[in-house]
Amino acid sequence: MTELKNDRYLRALLRQPVDVTPVWMMRQAGRYLPEYKATRAQAGDFMSLCKNAELACEVTLQPLRRYPLDAAILFSDILTIPDAMGLGLYFEAGEGPRFTAPVTCKGDVDKLPIPDPEDELGYVMNAVRTIRRELKGEVPLIGFSGSPWTLATYMVEGGSSKAFTVIKKMMYADPQALHLLLDKLAKSVTLYLNAQIKAGAQSVMIFDTWGGVLTGRDYQQFSLYYMHKIVDGLLRENDGRRVPVTLFTKGGGQWLEAMAETGCDALGLDWTTDIADARRRVGHKVALQGNMDPSMLYAPPARIEDEVATILAGFGQGEGHVFNLGHGIHQDVPPEHAGAFVEAVHRLSAQYHN
């Protein structure tokens, strides 16, 4: 494979020296970019875009043409695994993702296959290989998956949810069925991420978007336990280089110590966690990624710069920080504000690296 020209993102995840703090944005390939909207229209719909390696590659690269980002992230969706399990994924206008055949009981769980990543999910691996080829070693490529708990919420609720009553009913009334589902998902995610690594992903991230809706005890049992199993099963080296793993639980700021015990290399933070506090608590064990409120990108560039400066000062001197938003970029953010954000991170962070 081509030698990496810019590896500061990988170095920061391993708490190694860098010249400036690396930066990328969750959902950096997305609807805030007019060129993304044009490519998506060309694809016809969202899943057709995900399943076409050339177009998925095109949208992955679009933000890198605009901004000097330090990493590319595979353009895909967290629901590829449940889709490959045969749940009938579709997107309802204004409603988000839905499943025609949600999981309602242990009998449904028993019938679910564990997808072969090079077969049912081969389109994702094709996209990874295509993106790596087209990146020409400019920056590393991040692969990702949803966490078992987060995937299970969609599969059991039948789509997005606000209160999570359906999955919580299963969790409290039939925990055995839910554990069986989570175990199957943990095996599937491990295979899926390892296949992405073999196809060329240089770092992987597990998105636990809905872990924060759980009590501390339930988080440990139903979310973190299964992410830990995945981390234990991942390929940690490929192409002669360490493959860093980042865990991100939205709303998980109170559980950072337990998350850092999983053996991951980095933790993602949302904007409700104070980064200085997070570094005091776990900075000796893991790198930290985050954590500007994505809504800050609606502010004028001077205010964005002020927020970047505050977060950099909060993390302080030294290594182990990847700058990011605390969750995905909103679809109506002005693209030039995203540009001001990226530029400010690089310009203002050099003083923190000797």
UniProtKB/Swiss-Prot annotation:
One of its GO terms (cellular component) is cytosol. Gene3D superfamilies: 3.20.20.210. It comes from the Bacteria. Substrate binds at R27, Q28, A29, G30, R31, D77, Y154, T209, H327. GO terms for molecular function: uroporphyrinogen decarboxylase activity. The record marks D77 as: Transition state stabilizer. InterPro entries: UROD/MetE-like_sf (IPR038071), Uroporphyrinogen_deCO2ase_HemE (IPR006361), Uroporphyrinogen_deCOase (IPR000257). It is an enzyme of class 4 (lyase). The keyword Ribonucleoprotein does not apply. It catalyses: uroporphyrinogen III + 4 H(+) = coproporphyrinogen III + 4 CO2. PROSITE patterns: UROD_1 (PS00906), UROD_2 (PS00907). Its main location: cytoplasm. Belongs to the uroporphyrinogen decarboxylase family. NCBIfam families: hemE. Catalyzes the decarboxylation of four acetate groups of uroporphyrinogen-III to yield coproporphyrinogen-III. This is Uroporphyrinogen decarboxylase. The lineage of its organism: Bacteria, Pseudomonadati, Pseudomonadota, Gammaproteobacteria, Enterobacterales. The gene is hemE.
